[in-house]
């Protein structure tokens, strides 16, 4: 089992969230862009407890503005927002970020990790720290990792063997490893943004997508791809 990971990125130092020495006339706005909608555990945590804690502990000196479900903009807009200071934090998939450093494609290797403990050992150690620094060359600092869960295939029609899935169009990320893995499974990878996936499944542009359960349900993918294949490959 390999766990789908998200990377929390920032252009700000951790000290940004510490109380200012003097009260300000207006709060400093901290903008956070998230990939998932309200209803997803990660989004609800940041919209709820994280926002409340920061604003209370700083006595209102900081205000947390959350842009969920790519409402700030697409992947490119989020990266540029971090680089130019329009965003202070963002959650993003290593698969997408791998275009800036191929080492991040390690997360697209299927069946690499046996369980959560193995993932935590990897990311809390030397490898995780090195990967967190991989985006500094483009002005982005990796702040930490979020486990979104194990990936399964969500399909608009069922299949029981890989032979039945042959040539089915599957939504893929921009990662070359993810695309190659999908081809190795005998499927036809179709790279597209996560925000376009629901419509693509609804219109039949793709037959399925591999994603964790929380992300699928919060995005209502089960409405257009009701057949769950328990592959557990990521």
What are the functions of these language-model segments?
Residues 1-10:
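Bacterial N-terminal signal peptides that target proteins for export
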Residues 2, 17-24:
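Intrinsic low-complexity, intrinsically disordered segments enriched in polar/basic residues
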Residues 9-19:
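Bacterial N-terminal signal peptides
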Residues 24-118, 126-234:
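N-terminal secretory/targeting leader peptides
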């Amino acid at each position: 089992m390999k766990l789908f990971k998200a990377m929390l990125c920032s252009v700000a130092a951790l000290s940004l969230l510490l109380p200012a020495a003097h009260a300000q006339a207006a709060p400093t706005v901290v903008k956070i862009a998230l990939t998932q909608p309200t209803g997803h555990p990660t989004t609800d945590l940041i919209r709820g407890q994280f926002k409340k804690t920061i604003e209370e502990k700083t006595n209102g000196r900081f205000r947390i503005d959350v842009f969920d479900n790519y409402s700030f903009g697409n992947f490119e807009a989020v990266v540029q927002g971090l680089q130019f200071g329009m965003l202070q934090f963002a959650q993003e998939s290593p698969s997408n970020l791998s275009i800036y450093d191929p080492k991040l494609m390690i997360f697209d290797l299927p069946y690499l990790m046996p369980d959560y403990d193995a993932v935590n050992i990897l990311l809390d150690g030397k490898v995780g720290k090195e990967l967190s620094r991989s985006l500094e060359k483009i002005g982005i600092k990796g702040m930490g990792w979020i486990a979104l869960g194990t990936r399964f295939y969500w399909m608009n029609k069922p299949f029981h063997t890989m032979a039945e899935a042959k040539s089915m169009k599957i939504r893929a990320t921009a990662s070359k490893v993810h695309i190659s893995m999908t081809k190795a499974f005998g499927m036809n990878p179709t790279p597209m943004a996560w925000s376009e996936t629901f419509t693509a499944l609804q219109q039949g542009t793709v037959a399925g997508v591999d994603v964790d359960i929380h992300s699928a349900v919060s995005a209502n993918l089960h409405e257009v791809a009701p057949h769950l294949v328990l592959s557990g490959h990521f």
